[in-house]
Amino acid sequence: ERRHALTVAELAQRFDKEHIAVRLKPGTAQEYRRNLRRFILPAIGRLKVADVSKADVARLHHELRHIPYQANRNLEVVSKMFNLAELWGLRSDGSNPRRHLRKYPEEKRERYLSPAELAALGEALSRAEQERVEDPYAIAAIRLLIFTGCRLNEIMTLKWSYVDFEARCLRLPDTKTGARIVHLGAPALDVLSRIER
């Protein structure tokens, strides 16, 4: 009987403790918790886990249609949480209320700096470096972002042990998509060689 009385808010606590906290990388965990706190729990937190319907989840998704990226991320969190609810015996198998709900199309989120913007940024970094108004590590980090195409977190957590000057690459052991090698061109190698160790 207890399992039928469990609310989505209570399920979310277990989901956090047994999945988010132990299986997700910190950035993803933070995003899952934010989605739960801001969108999912206010919408369906008081409902009984066993009673949540496809219509409830569709309503949550539809209310965020003006921000498709956010709506779709919430759908992913709900889907994972209810998959685990099935695994934990809180719902019958194959009853995930997210099933068959289609995601909204998303606009590509990539934006590249124009040649003029890149030139202006380069000049600003050079000025900041010459005038010593900015931390040299911050300037180097921005340059590495530009020259490598790495994610911000990959550069911010970069260690010297990941840098292979001989092979001209970064060997990143734990990125968002797993281990990967980033090949370094001359500008990136120059930036790295000028950083104090």
Regions found by a protein language model. Give the residues of each.
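Basic, Lys/Arg- and aromatic-enriched nucleic-acid-binding interface segment
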Residues: 68-77, 87-152, 156, 166, ...
